[in-house]
Amino acid sequence: MLGFIKDWLDDNAREIKKLQRVVDEINKLEPEIAAKSDGDLQGMTAVFRDRLDRGESLDGILPEAFAVVREASRRVLGMRHFDVQLMGGIVLHQGRIAEMKTGEGKTLVATLPVYLNALTGKGVHVVTVNDYLARRDSEWMGQVYKYLGLSVGLIVHGLDWEERKRSYRADVTYGTNNEFGFDYLRDNMALHPDQLVQRELNYAIVDEVDSILIDEARTPLIISGQAEKSTDLYYTFARIVPRLVPEVDYNVDEKAHTVVITETGVAKVEKMLGVENLYDDRNIELTHHLNQALKAHALMKRDRDYVVKDGQVIIVDEFTGRLMFGRRYSDGLHQAIEAKEGVKIERESQTLATITFQNYFRMYRKLAGMTGTAATEEQEFKKIYGLDVVVIPTNKPMIRKDLPDVIYKTEQAKFRAVVEEIAARHARGQPVLVGTISIEKSEMLSGMLKKRGIPHQVLNAKYHDKEAEIVAQAGRLGAVTIATNMAGRGTDILLGGNPEFLARNELRRMGHECEAAAEIAGAPAEQDGAYKALLEKFRRQTEEERRRVVELGGLHIIGTERHESRRIDNQLRGRCGRQGDPGSSQFFSSLEDDLMRLFGSENIAGIMDRLGIDEDMPIEHAMITKSIEAAQKRVENRNFDIRKHVLQYDDVMNQQRELIYRQRRQVLTGENLKENVLEMIGTCVERAVNTYAPEGVHPEEWDLKGLLEHAEHLFLPGHGLTAGDLAGMSRRELQEFLTERSRAAYDAREQELGADTMREIERVIMLRIVDEKWMDHLDAMDQLREGIGLRAYGQKDPLVEYKFEGYEMFQNMIASIQDDVVRYIFRVNVVQPQQQRQSRRVVENRYAEEGPKQPARRENKVGRNDPCPCGSGRKYKKCCGRAEAV
């Protein structure tokens, strides 16, 4: 009875019961669907589409559609969806997040809602974290969709414009979050409708949703062009800052991730630079460079935050340990790090278009996600994205043992204990996966294991290419694998090893070549006797190894440091105990670890000191684990507050972006061009009358001469009017007279050029000016945001001030757009029609050659003499790179 009451009170348990009723319906249909021939089964797609056309809902056909996908998967892939996978599919269709543990088959789960929603013909996007997974899943799961008559597209780095357009027209499109976001930005820089690649954003399923929507939430996608600033000052400050003394000339706050120069430090820098006052208005650029150089030297650590590879500074993802190619820190920080490391400095950039993942994914009509760890961030998913989290039960009971944390006084003592633990388990043959938080720590541990003669594999950002292969074999007998954080997500660790990987490797050694596509799909190209014999041999070997590994307790996970997010720790633990396998996990910590040092080691340190505990003597108690988790919760809450605060500022910019992009799209497709221009002319006339003949001022004091000069310059060139012609008119009469004259001039211009040419001129001019003004507005808003925090000292709410001033700046930008459009419309000289073929070729090229505080994902910078990324066919310096009279 008590259990019943507990379940009744448990929201998640109630959800599972609701889902089970739908699963029962699907299971009842299984015999009927299984009896169908291939032709009849494949014909169900047309039947479903016909029923939808007649008004039936997706929910109405869900049980049958899911039963069809389950049977198609069984026939094509040899994989039948478990009941819990059906539950996950229902949750995804409902636009929620399904939390499913590692190894529960999330990739297969997605086929159910993807097929169902693709039947509408509006497109479904499946979003993965990297190109490898996008390729693998589109090839692997694509077999099911193609069997059922759906088309499958793939969006990865390096595709040209036509390939992208074709992929987006498919029923199902796989790709990475970066590519989807950049394509959205590029579509909003297009100059012709046929340059658009994306359709309306309908339905997206985000794999590893926590990684993309939370870890990367504040990361802006940026398309940028080169600015004209010199890089000399970065080298200057890279020489100055190392001569400053920590805690004397500057103070570092690791918890807040800030560094502040002291008055002593300011005096030293002024002397070295030979300036009288560093904070004089003329020296603003110097203070900016000093601040970035201090951050680069005091906060950013090589082999933790970034690596230097092939003469480039490459950011390391703090959550996955992967190298983030193409991503750069903004605001000059990346250049400061390049100067610190003595590599070539890339020029600073100017933002052409930008959006955050938070704002991009909120534009989808329906959004869903799946991950192994979402429950800890349930509040954030709900508040920011409106997404509920449903925890799906495992197919088999979870029998993994999570051992209490052990904590040491020093980091050295901790790593000595980790090595002893690895050695003991390795001696028995039990496979061990060790998680570290940085490349530096993984290589230090690797060195200690080498000294002990323990064979092992290292998987970190430096060895990214081998990732899937190393992770797949981490469950072999006696295997020791060191992995930076969560590298290798998306690849299952099979106890005993993966026979297909082993067979392919052996084939390579024998000189055979495996086809890339077949390899991605998990089926090698070599289907001859040699491959089959090898596969059979390795299957027997891995089955025997699996039996022995299970007897030894399965894969053992060792965490060498607690991450500030419990979710990341849970992801590491989740690498073992898949599908009911045995496994165990334990975290080793020290009082010198970042989390313990910054967030709550005082109590534990006090206990250890009072007890006189030696540095090699650990404390192991459930209370310690709870204390660490309490520290993690404090950090998580702080990070959530930061993300929520940032989003409040982003929302201001997002509303402006949506309005500009919506109006830009109407111009692009040629909607109401003439009406828009005539309305702009009327607005410009009204604004001019308000300026030169303001209300409440006596007519004798009106500046009619200035009004006519303004009209000549803007909306009535060559008018031949004098102030006497306007004398005696009221404000309303002035406005009506000037509007009528300017519209007559517009009509004459249209008659001279022809209506079709006039529409094309209007479209191109409006697009160019909107893009140019929007680019400047982005920079201005960025600068406003940088300094707005200081308003708090004047007892003003910075967010309210930002909204108010941002709105004023936006209105000024709109007025400036209207003025420039009207001015250019009356003055443009037509030499020859714009050749769309040329601009289309430029668009294809820009797709083929793809570029905070938070690191920004950038496309490669646009050089001054490169084709402009807007697709105009002009050089960047002659187009979006500067204001241009068309």
Swiss-Prot record:
Zn(2+) binds at residues 868, 870, 879-880. It is a peripheral membrane protein. One of its GO terms (cellular component) is plasma membrane. PROSITE patterns: SECA, SECA_MOTOR_DEAD. Part of the Sec protein translocase complex. Interacts with the SecYEG preprotein conducting channel. Has a central role in coupling the hydrolysis of ATP to the transfer of proteins into and across the cell membrane, serving as an ATP-driven molecular motor driving the stepwise translocation of polypeptide chains across the membrane. HAMAP family: SecA. This is Protein translocase subunit SecA. The gene is secA.
